[in-house]
């Protein structure tokens, strides 16, 4: 136990200190939680003070229904506690077999895409996940040329004694993409666009890019892994998932000479990344990066100032922006 944990127990639950310390020191203690990971915009240039936190909790496969319910109740209480600090947290309970079953059993909700996207959700997780606690993710450390051979390669390494699966969390490879998933994921982004239109513009166009490359989509998650394992630190994406999305979209639209859409996407990216710039010092890395990008795009000072004045836009300008967003989303869909 850390000093903080020991002090907390001593003050709040002194009667439990001895039992908890004994359990922690026991080799036979059962650890139901294998790993905790946050995904999405966390740590990226698009994260703002209003961004929510999507947290995956990977637990043992054999937890009873009652144990899963108790774990879910605990995450609910943590979410309620976080809300008192104006932080929105969403927890998702996962097992390592979740994506191998080729079915996403949870129903469609405001924060859960259900079966609308399957491999695409896992790909987003791999390209943006940050490990908070627990075991590292095997997929991020194991390079396989053909994703369809990922499971076979893992089995080979385990059989050869070169890999201990108990040291890792493994949600599986990205070799089971289906064309229908792009349709479901696009619908989901249209729905999410109601609350987060600028982010949805980026994501739905990435789906369009992937769909054009199907069945050999050049996944950002694989690009990140290849760069990491090869020691190649590229100045293009900085291992930032949203900068990488913009780069891929830009390559796709430029190749198709769709410069009007490219310009609109850049505007959406700028707006999303600068939503709370008033909170930051002028030397903040996000401000410096966006200024550099705007200069590379050839934007005028007037255009930048106009976008920076979004909170003061008149109703006519707001309506125009909304209509442009809706038209763009529908065109990409």
Q: Residue ranges of each PLM-predicted region?
A:
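Acidic, Ser/Thr-rich peripheral helices and adjacent loops at domain boundaries
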Residues: 109-118
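Conserved structured core elements
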Residues: 30, 49-50, 65, 69-72, ...
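E2/UBC-UEV (E2-variant) core
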Residues: 70, 74-90
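Catalytic micro-motifs at enzyme active sites that drive phosphoryl/nucleotidyl and oxygen chemistry
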Residues: 23-27, 35-47, 78-82
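Short, conserved secondary-structure transition motifs
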Residues: 87-109
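Nucleotidyltransferase catalytic cores
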Residues: 1-15, 101-109, 126-333
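Helical scaffold of the NTase/Pol beta-like nucleotidyltransferase catalytic core
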Residues: 1-35, 67-73
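Catalytic metal-binding acidic patch
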Residues: 45-69, 88-91
